[in-house]
UniProtKB/Swiss-Prot annotation:
GO terms for cellular component: DNA-directed RNA polymerase complex. GO terms for molecular function: DNA binding; DNA-directed RNA polymerase activity; magnesium ion binding; zinc ion binding. This is DNA-directed RNA polymerase subunit beta'. The gene is rpoC. Signal peptide: none annotated. Zn(2+) 2 binds at residues 819, 893, 900, 903. Residues 1392-1413 are annotated as: Disordered. GO terms for biological process: DNA-templated transcription. The RNAP catalytic core consists of 2 alpha, 1 beta, 1 beta' and 1 omega subunit. When a sigma factor is associated with the core the holoenzyme is formed, which can initiate transcription. Belongs to the RNA polymerase beta' chain family.
């Protein structure tokens, strides 16, 4: 009996392990796993349902069917445990061993493992140095391979056909050996001496010069070294023994009616066994070679299908023509083992239901239906019932609960008290998608949710469902309460803004209450306090919006900081305010001034208000305040009684005339087009322009009319005040709707797009109040349907982007406080087109300064390096006008395997410095992925209005100051005395008196400068102007024009202007030129001086050559005198076709995948002077001579726009040919900082367009992960191979080791990988395999004998350990510390013992943690 009780006590202790290793199994290893050989293909006897002996389900091999009972029934009961029945040979034990015991099949002929053969690049091919095609021919018995050439002229591994073989046998007899099939390949593999091969390859690598060979050798070397290091023998890639999966993992289930449902694996195994047995028999019978060969080939194919069906040839199919699911299919893909069972498990103690609004709840509560709670907390209730003695057994308790007796409800209340539950709404796109609440029991069947947390869950009450989960253990409850409780998560981790902002009716109520009206009832009255105002309002003496004077008591921070002094003291002030605002002042938290409420509260204002409360009053007060705001908002909205009707949509009276005028203009353009003055494209662009301007004008007229209304003030004068129109108030407050939607209701609907994105040129002139006619309705259906289709696509794409981002960053966790680096990036305000898009304060808030921040006026240090810049700091920095701050960034963090808190800065979701253990990688991925669904999917065609609006024609200063030009600015003075810019990348800056940069503007080539360097100017002064429609070609030298290759009809064509009748020459496109000869020439101009000599570039022997691009209109004549700064030709900007701008989600994906754009711009590889070399066919040759005098050539297609001209000095990394930038080039030539700035700015552009705020540091975290691999350029004395890509941390560790040993470290280049590539190339094979390309990843890992140190989150989830983040990080740290201290104690005791016996002391070996196989 005691043994029985002990048995129940033994809880299987899970083994503690720190790593998992994968490798190739040797045949002996497979046999050692096996409990017996499966000899027969039979499964179970269909009459008795007992497994057949020696078959696939044999009880003798795999274990008993029933617990502690042998097959024939001779031994039953526990007492026979471990006995092997002599009748049926079955061991008496637990039936669950059928899930663990494996069998094996001895193959009659060896078989190649298809993964190592067919998974590209073929591992077998690499080891043998043969092509995949050749190996396949040998394996599938189509050709012979020479094993030992002997004394013959044949070479080893040579392939020969059967015919060849017989001829050679006749010629040389048995001097040589050739084989076919897997035996042959196995012999070749056995013959390989790996160490020797590695040596030869290393020497070959050093001595060879050809790129292709280096690549090939390096690849082979990598595979061979892997075998060498892991101790795996190459011949193990050929199987002699096939393991058989335990039968419970490939079950056979009897259905009713005598049929069976079976796993496909059983079919596949049966086929292998049948063919194997047939082959054995044929070999015994000494059958003819050709029959045996065919059988061997069939066996190879059967094993192939079992391992990876469909990898080679046609997939094996079952009875219903469906391909069978092989072992490989079991683990890969969304339904495979990794993603279905290991990363996404079903959860006990959970339920789901529809959500309804719970306006009476506190922020940290949720309403839980009683029945649901009863079910979820059942075990807790059973326990309580037993403890209280209401029920004696679990069974009795169960009955009690099922009958729902009153005592059960009381106990439920008790159990639920202070026991948080977690609510989750799918899709969980960021961490706020799961939050913890304290349950409040309610009647009904729907979960009640607090309205303020809806924004975080992205929930609404139109039928959304949510799931409830119960944290069981004490630790889980504690974490849920401290970390996940809704009232502790009030900020968005993406940008640090409050997530508990009111929306819709709350906003409307607050807005209505804080508006002011002219001449409201009781205007001008004075009140002694808020209570008096409330009394007057309740008695209808005053209206909500009336202006009154009120004495208001504010609680302000106490200046007196001494002991026992109260933190807040009252301060009484008389405010001119409105009744509504005075009433709201009641709920103001201590420490906030009344001024924050003394304005109309729109949605943005309320968000700012809550943010201020959080920063000034702390979390607790903010949560209470938000709750009270919500209550007030609902109450006031109800009291306001706002509703809308058709009459609220006021159509502007000017609409008719505006639309009429537009129609006239359109007719005029049609007429011009008919008479051939404009092209069809121009006409279309103009028409679209007119209509979009018209709908703007109508919209503006409508808004003007809606937004104000005439009133009479107290003195009887007519004035206008902001309107109380319901529709206007809803849009203005941010409660619902927008100006655009109102425009469709009361203005005109405007232009519509076709499904392909092009705009239909006839707009919808009606609005919804007037109603649409049939045609208009039909046109608008396009857009509506496309919207729905787009949304569906977008969700999938956005989800996939998030998945890739999470995968690449999942192992990035904050692991230490400070890595001590002195690197960082310089942050400036982000300026575009002279506008400040993102202020400096927003970019440095919550970052750690890396250099001292100095007051520019007094030169004293304001903030030392290492200071976390909070709100007060950034406000001070902004006030002093500091325009650049160097801050720490995740990109330059020197922590290996993780990040440090200082480089990351503030945890945006908590508002303080990030904690060690925070999974910042996943947070970054979620912050970028979550708003993905709000981005657009389409590619924008910028044409017509949009492109014209985007073109500027001048720059003007926004602030007073002094003009300064950058070093790259060059200009010449023309005959009229104007300064003409001839540099491509010149910029003008405005600096203040202290020389601090205030703004910066690009000044394009050909602009006329109106202010020169050093001029003092006022805000609003124009700095430069230019013609936006054409780009000029300007001469920097004077002289007589001499044309070269300018031949009419060959390189140029004459164009006659319809209106003026003047003729100009236009350079024709290369493709349209007739003869071959004329394709390679380039029309250009040389200048002659007074003596008829060619004008030279000063200081060189080169003549001045000015080339004309395709489409240029040449404005000078041959032989004409020109002055410096004169225009030789103009290139119409229209000729630069409207280029498609990839926007939205595809653009973000493109950036993170680090794709090189097609037609990328070219950057200068070196710093030097440019010149043009001899042109080749269709290409121009640009030469850069560096400072040492070396020449670097670039070949550039003729139609590309070169941004530099002769003899210009360019810097390394400067753009010399126009086009989209290639991130890889930026990294190579400008470094990590420039790359990060490029990616961050580009990604932010996309999100900013949609009004989404994301903090830069999230994008930087992802860029860090994209840069985590390096390419070895010189391997020094390390184990790396030149050209190999390795993990940065590995390389740094190895280099540290080399330096410690006094050897030569490796040198390397940074490599930028796209997120998919980066995820697949992580060190953890478990994580990579669960992401994509499972087969390839596992094949590679097995050969390398890779060890996964379980550093990331994903690997740990998969093996079922606590993840090394948050509390899990602390847990693992503590565990490892305890292990090492235990080990030290063990060593110490061992040493003492050894000393006592006077035995010679041997060095104690550290017991290493065994890696689980």
């Amino acid at each position: 009996m005691k043994a029985l009780l002990d048995l129940f006590k033994q809880v299987q202790q899970e083994e503690v392990f720190d790593a998992i290793k994968i490798g190739l199994a040797s045949p002996d290893k497979i046999r050692s796993w096996s409990f017996g050989e499966v000899k027969k293909p039979e499964t179970i006897n269909y009459r008795t349902f007992k497994p057949e002996r020696d078959g696939l389900f044999c009880a003798k091999i795999f274990g008993p069917i029933k617990d502690y009972e042998c097959l024939c029934g001779k031994y039953k009961r526990l007492k026979h445990r471990g006995v092997i029945c002599e009748k049926c040979g079955v061991e008496v034990t637990l039936a669950k061993v059928r899930r663990e015991r494996m069998g094996h099949i001895e193959l009659a002929s060896p078989v190649a493992h298809i993964w190592f053969l067919k998974s590209l690049p073929s591992r077998l091919g690499m080891v043998l140095d043969m092509t995949l095609r050749d190996i396949e021919r040998v394996l599938y018995f189509e050709a012979y391979v020479v094993i030992e050439p002997g004394m013959t002229p044949l070479k080893a591994r040579q392939i020969m056909t059967e015919e060849d073989y017989y001829n050679k046998v006749e010629e040389y007899g048995d001097e040589f050996r050739a084989e076919m099939g897997a035996e042959g390949v196995r012999e070749l593999l056995r013959a390989i001496n790996i160490d020797e091969q590695v040596e030869t390859l290393r020497t070959e690598l050093k001595n060879t010069g050809s790129e292709a060979k280096i690549k090939k050798y390096a690849k082979r070397l990598k595979v061979l070294e892997a075998f060498q290091r892991s101790g795996i023998k190459p011949e193990w890639m050929i199987l002699e023994v096939l393991p058989v999966l335990p039968p419970e993992l490939r079950p056979l289930v009897p259905l009713d009616g005598g049929r069976f449902a079976t796993s496909d694996l059983n079919d596949l195994y049966r086929r292998v066994i049948n063919r194997n047995n047939r082959l054995k028999r044929l070999l015994e019978l000494k059958a003819p070679e050709i029959i045996v060969r065919n059988e061997k080939r069939m066996l190879q194919e059967a094993v192939d299908s079992l391992l990876d069906n469909g990898r080679r040839g046609k997939a094996m199919t079952g009875a219903n023509k469906r391909p069978l699911k092989s072992l490989a299919d079991m683990i890969k893909g969304k339904g495979g083992r990794f993603r279905q069972n290991l990363l996404g498990k079903r959860v006990d103690y959970s339920g789901r239901s529809v959500i309804v609004v719970g306006p009476t709840l506190k922020l940290h509560q949720c309403g839980l239906p009683k029945l649901m709670a009863l079910e979820l907390f059942k075990p807790f209730i059973f326990n309580k019932l037993e403890v209280m003695g209401v029920a004696t057994t679990i069974k009795a308790a169960k009955k009690e609960v099922e009958n729902q007796t009153p005592v059960v409800w009381d106990i439920l209340e008790e159990v639920i008290r202070e026991h948080p539950v977690m609510l989750n709404r799918a899709p969980t796109l960021h961490r706020l998608g799961i939050q913890a609440f304290e349950p409040v029991l309610i009647e009904g069947k729907a979960i009640q949710l607090h309205p303020l947390v809806c924004a975080a869950f992205n929930a609404d009450f139109d039928g959304d469902q949510m799931a409830v989960h119960v944290p069981l253990s004490l630790e889980a409850q504690m974490e849920a309460r401290t970390l996940m409780l809704a009232s502790n998560n009030v900020l968005f981790p993406a940008n640090g803004d409050p997530s508990i902002v009111p929306s819709q009716d709350i906003v409307l109520g607050l807005y209505y209450a804080t508006r002011e009206a002219v001449n409201g009832k009781g205007e001008g009255l004075s009140f002694t306090g808020v209570s008096e105002v409330i009394r007057a309002y309740e008695n209808k003496e005053v209206e909500l919006a009336s202006r009154v004077n009120v004495r208001i008591t504010e609680m302000v921070h106490n200046e007196d900081k001494s002991e026992g002094a109260p933190p807040f003291v009252p301060k009484i002030t008389l405010y001119a305010t409105t009744v509504g605002r005075a009433i709201l002042s009641e709920i103001l938290p201590h420490g906030l001034p009344f001024s924050v409420l003394n304005k109309p509260l729109k949605k943005k204002e309320i968000s700012r208000l809550i943010n201020t409360a959080f920063r000034k009053c702390g979390l607790r007060a903010t949560v209470v305040f938000a709750d009270q705001l919500m209550q007030s908002g609902f109450r006031l909205a109800t009291r306001a009684g706002i509703s809308i009707c058709v009459d609220d949509m006021l159509v502007p009276p000017q609409k008719e005339t505006i639309v009429g005028d537009a129609a006239k203009k359109v007719k005029e353009y049609d007429r011009q087009y008919m008479s051939g003055l404009v092209t069809a494209q121009e006409r279309y662009n103009n028409v679209v322009d007119i209509w979009s301007a018209t709908s703007e004008a109508v919209g503006k007229a409508m808004m003007e009319q809606l937004s104000t209304e005439p009133v009479t003030d107290r003195d009887g004068n007519e004035t206008r005040q902001e309107s109380f129109n319901s529709i206007y108030m809803m849009a203005d407050s941010g409660a619902r709707g927008s100006a655009v939607q109102i425009r469709q209701l009361a203005g005109m609907r405007g232009l519509m797009a076709k499904p392909d994105g092009s705009i239909i040129e006839t707009p919808i002139t009606a609005n919804f109040r007037e109603g649409l006619n049939v045609l208009q309705y039909f046109i608008s259906t396009h857009g509506a349907r496309k919207g729905l289709a787009d949304t569906a696509l977008k969700t999938a794409n956005s989800g996939y982007l998030t998945r890739r981002l999470v995968d690449v960053t999942q192992d990035l966790v904050v692991v230490e406080d400070d890595c001590g680096t002195s690197n960082g990036v310089a942050m400036k305000a982000l300026v575009e087109g002279g506008e400040v898009v993102e202020a400096l304060r927003d970019r440095i808030l919550g970052r750690v300064a890396v250099a001292d921040v100095v007051n520019p006026e007094t030169q004293e240090t304001l903030y030392e390096s290492g200071t976390l810049l909070d709100e007060t700091a950034v406000e001070e920095i902004e006030r002093l006008g500091i325009d650049e701050v160097r801050v720490r960034t995740p990109l330059t963090c020197e922590t290996r395997y993780g990040l440090c808190a200082a480089c990351y800065g503030r945890d945006l979701g908590r508002g303080s410095l990030v904690n060690v253990g925070e999974a910042v990688g996943v947070i970054a991925a979620q912050s970028i992925g979550e708003p993905g669904t709000q981005l657009t999917m389409r590619t924008f065609h910028i044409g017509g209005a949009a492109s014209r609006a985007a073109v500027a024609s001048s720059v003007e200063a926004k602030s007073n100051g002094i003009v300064r030009f950058t070093a790259t600015m060059r200009y010449v003075t023309n005959a009229k005395g104007e300064q003409i810019v001839i540099s491509r990348s010149g910029e003008a800056m405005i600096t203040d008196d202290f020389g601090r940069e205030r703004e910066r503007h690009k000044v394009p080539y050909g602009a006329t400068l109106l202010q020169l360097d050093g001029a003092t100017i006022k805000a609003g002064t124009q700095l430069a102007t230019w013609d936006p429609l054409t780009r000029p070609i300007i001469t920097e030298y004077g002289g007589t024009v001499k044309f070269e290759n300018v031949e009419e009809g060959v390189t140029v064509a004459k164009q006659i202007d319809d209106v003026t009748g003047l003729s100009t020459l236009v350079v024709i496109d290369v493709k349209r030129r007739g003869s071959q000869a004329s394709k390679s020439v380039r029309p250009q101009v040389k200048l002659l001086d007074a003596n008829g000599e060619e004008v030279k570039i000063p200081g060189t022997e080169h003549a001045v050559q000015i080339g004309f691009q395709v489409g240029a209109l040449i404005t000078v004549k041959d032989g004409q005198q020109v002055q410096v700064g004169e225009v030789l030709a103009r290139i119409p900007t229209e000729a630069q076709k409207t280029r498609d701008i990839t926007g939205g989600l595809p653009r973000v994906a493109e950036l993170f995948e680090a794709r090189s754009p097609k037609d990328a711009g070219i950057l200068a590889e070196v710093t030097g002077t440019t010149s043009f070399g001899k042109d080749t066919k269709g290409k121009q040759r640009l030469v850069i001579t560096d400072l040492e005098g070396n020449q670097h050539e670039f070949l550039i297609a003729k139609e590309k726009q070169v941004l530099v001209h002769d003899a210009q000095v360019v810097n390394k990394g400067e753009m010399i040919v126009d086009g989209p930038a290639d991130p890889h080039d930026i990294l190579r030539l400008q470094g990590i900082e420039a790359l990060s700035r490029y990616i961050v700015d580009e990604v932010q552009d996309v999100y900013r367009l949609q009004g989404v705020k994301i903090n830069d540091k999230h994008i930087e975290v992802i860029v860090r992960q994209m840069l985590r691999r390096v390419q070895i350029t010189d391997n020094g004395d390390t184990r790396f191979i030149p050209g190999e890509q390795v993990e940065r941390s590995d390389m740094l560790d190895e280099n540290d080791r080399m330096i410690a040993e006094g050897k030569r470290p490796a040198s390397y280049d940074n490599v930028l990988l796209g997120i998919t590539k980066a995820s697949l190339s992580t060190d953890s094979f478990i994580s990579a395999a669960s992401f994509q390309e499972t087969t390839r990843v596992l094949t590679e890992a097995a050969i390398m004998g890779k060890r996964d140190d379980l550093r990331g989150l994903k690997e740990n989830v998969i093996v079922g350990r606590l993840i090394p983040a948050g509390t899990g990080l602390a847990f693992h740290k503590a565990r490892k510390a305890k292990e090492s201290s235990d080990r030290e104690r063990f060593d110490q005791i061992a040493a003492e013992e050894a000393f006592d016996f006077g035995t010679p002391s041997a060095p104690a070996e550290e017991p290493q943690h065994p890696a689980a196989e």
